[in-house]
Amino acid sequence: MSETTGLPLKHLQGSPPGTPVNTNNESNEASPDDGCRLPDTVTEAEASSDNHGSVLGDNNRNVEVAVGASDNATKQKVYHTGWRLHALTSALCLSLLLSTLETTIVSTALVSIVDALHGFNMAGWIVTSYLVTYTGFLIIYSKLSDIFGCKLMLLLAITIFTVFSMACGASDSMVPLIVFRAFQGMGGSGIYSLSTIMVPLMVPPEKYATYISIMSSTFILSSVLGPILGGAITDHTTWRWVFYFNGPGGALAAVLLAFSVPFNFPYGESDRFFHSLASKQMWKRVDFVGMTVSLAASILIIFALEQGGVAYPWGSGAIVSTFVLSGVLWIAFIAWERLLSKRDGVREPMFPWSLVHNRFVMGLLLNGFFTGFPFMAALINIPQRFQTVNMTSAINAGIRTLPLLLLSPLATAINGILVSKLRVPPLYTLFLGGSLQTIGVGLYSSLKSSTSIASAQYGYEAIMGLGFGFNLSTILMMVPLVVTEKDLAVTMGSVTQIRVLGGTIGLAVCSALLINHIKREAVKFLTAEQVAQILLSSENIGMLSIETQSRTRVLYADAYSEQMRVMLYFSIASILSLVLLVERQPRKAPAKPERAG
């Protein structure tokens, strides 16, 4: 038996829930629970006693039908094909692109924003307010999609994100902008969470690796493009377009989503969906206590990580008490989820306790957490190093990160082929990604402290990019192989949330390392006032004498290398976490079923 949920390992390897079964029988009957069939879809037939489904015809042609587990065995999953699949994929990619851009695009637009709104002392909150809600709502959206449906929750997320993006662009002072950014992050969180959850529900299992590679490539591309686009916008037009361009993009994504899938996704049309939505029984399923506690715990820890060493010293009462309170709330959340999981009631726990006993889930969570550290550190700090140490512009710094930008999506595409076409066990590609990531980070940390750019630096970026590409896509590919369908959404949400949390902690660690290194070493040749000025803004380095400027930039190079050396330890930890995923016969992506006769 598998150590996951009591399912036979063979079932998980070859035929996970929802695996399509081909047949040549034809019928135009639709299940009562499914409502009407949509054109350009492939339906999942109702399971019979011999585990073979009845077949649905589609315009006198044979179609694939699927039999699998769901919360209600009478529901039939409808896979998308044709224009509906292309429209849905476009909607997911576009919305994911926009929401992910917003996590990094303000990094190069920040100076222009605070100068225009006269709020330099509140600049950090433009980033923090987005991150606290972006991180806190990931698992909440995942669980609510189980209850209220993916389409409704994603439309809600896109609407919130788009409306408050426009509000951010129209802001005339810092306080409204910070508040609107928090709501924008709430919408962006739902987009990120649901775009990964919907992939295994919209295509058959054998196509999942291909489509998750598309989503992972979009995520990585947008993460790296953010600073480049932010710099280009602020250099050639007003900073307000950093937010305004989400308006038409968000509207287009919402329209594509609205017309490509039914509200009862992935189970086809149903005239009972909105009636069920209004029922008290459905609302009783929501774990309001777990949602509130997990959200508060996430917000507090992100606040402490973002503001520690910036607005408040790390040892201050504000930061220490925030960390302690967050820890207490996380303990309370764990205790509540365990209690709720043991109850035989209607309310569904945010994080089912059975997943804690699943070593594969724990392995994926640990791997995602540790991978988040070097991933975000590389995305943010490599462009900063080019700007601060090598004196390049924001756009030029972005261009110099192209090896990282281009190789990551390439790795996800290769990974999709390896896992889905060649059926290489995802564990192997995860180990490959972790190894490349570790080698790349290690080599980058060995760069000489100099204001000149070593050509080898681009090679190190490429190696890191390949590692990140393999890692980030494989983690999501493995989730459907280690959990049942009823736990798929919450596990996906947990993996994405803990990866974002790891990245946020990684950035906080890097910031602390840089500040401490500069404070410790710069006092040897700068006054206390000069040290404070260069920590306030790296642009102030230009106010120093020529000789001191060069020495200061070399000092920053030392600090950036130290950051990567520490990130190397987390990369190694991500490889060690794979021990929890090891098994005698590593599971593979399901093979495409052969058509009968």
UniProtKB/Swiss-Prot annotation:
Disulfide partners: none
Ranges of biased composition (kind: Polar residues): 20-30, 46-55
Superkingdom as given in the UniProt entry: Eukaryota
Glycosylation sites recorded in the entry for this protein: N25, N72, N390
GO molecular function: transmembrane transporter activity
Keywords (A to Z) from UniProt: Glycoprotein, Membrane, Transmembrane, Transmembrane helix, Transport
Pathway connected to this protein: Secondary metabolite biosynthesis
Transmembrane segments: 94-114, 120-140, 147-167, 183-203, 214-234, 241-261, 286-306, 316-336, 360-380, 402-422, 424-444, 463-483, 498-518, 562-582
Induction entry: Expression is induced in the presence of 6mM glutamine.
Subcellular location: Membrane
Membrane topology reported for the UniProt record: Multi-pass membrane protein
A cellular-component GO term for this protein: plasma membrane
Region (Disordered), start-end ranges: 1-55
PROSITE patterns reported in the protein's UniProt record: MFS (PS50850)
Similarity field: Belongs to the major facilitator superfamily. TCR/Tet family.
Cited function: MFS-type transporter; part of the gene cluster that mediates the biosynthesis of the gamma-pyrones fusapyrone (FPY) and deoxyfusapyrone (dFPY).
Protein name: MFS-type transporter FPY5
Species annotation: Fusarium mangiferae (Mango malformation disease fungus)
